[in-house]
Every structure is written in structure tokens, then in C-alpha cells.
């Protein structure tokens, strides 16, 4: 963890999704769990980071405004210390792109 990180715990998951009890339906959480498990990655749910971003004019008011926040463990795509891309950068980018497509499909199928 970086010094500025709120959570200094080791053993972070590969990916983390931040959720909101009002704006993140269980459906999105289950899709996320299944996707990352199938890909062989670990997934934290609100661990080590929690919450998601919702426009204030909809926050806790508009139930059909959904929100999920994706955090990616730097160890997957960076050589540390520093900010050089690792050999896994492209693979990580492709995984994220595929995940976003899965989420988009989930919205379209409703």
C-alpha cells in the first residue's frame, strides 16, 4: 500500500468493487464475482476500498441510477516502485474492457 492509502493492510485482492447499498443492486455484485472468479482473479467487495460515486441530485433518491466502482491492484499492471507498465499491462487492460462489456450487456438485458 502507498503511504496515502487509508487501508495499510497487506494481501489486497486483484480487483475490488466499491458499492452503495442504495445504488448497487446485488445483480451487479454477483456478475462481478462470477466474472473475476472465472478469470482467475481475486475480488474484494468494499475491501480495501468502499463506496461508489453517484451524482448528488440522484444520491439516495433515484433507485434506477446504479453505481459500482472498480479498483485495480497496481501490482497487476505496474512495476513498483515507479510507474512503469509491467508485462501484464495489456492483459489487465483487456480484462477490464471485457468486464465493462459484461456490465453494459447486463444493463441492456434489463
Ranges and model annotations:
Residues 80-110:
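His/Asp/Glu-rich mid-to-C-terminal helical/loop segments that flank catalytic regions of hydrolases
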Residues 1-78:
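Catalytic cores of processing enzymes, dominated by hydrolases/peptidases
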Amino acid at each position: 500500500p502507498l503511504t496515502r492509502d487509508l487501508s495499510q493492510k497487506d494481501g489486497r485482492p486483484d480487483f475490488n468493487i466499491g458499492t452503495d447499498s442504495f445504488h448497487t443492486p446485488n445483480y451487479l455484485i454477483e456478475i462481478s464475482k462470477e466474472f473475476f472468479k472465472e478469470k482467475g482473479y481475486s475480488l474484494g467487495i468494499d475491501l480495501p476500498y468502499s463506496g461508489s460515486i453517484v451524482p448528488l441530485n440522484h444520491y439516495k433518491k433515484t433507485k434506477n441510477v446504479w453505481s459500482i466502482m472498480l479498483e485495480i491492484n497496481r501490482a497487476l499492471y505496474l512495476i513498483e516502485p515507479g510507474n512503469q507498465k509491467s508485462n501484464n499491462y495489456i492483459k489487465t487492460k483487456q480484462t477490464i474492457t471485457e468486464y465493462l462489456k459484461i456490465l453494459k450487456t447486463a444493463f441492456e438485458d434489463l
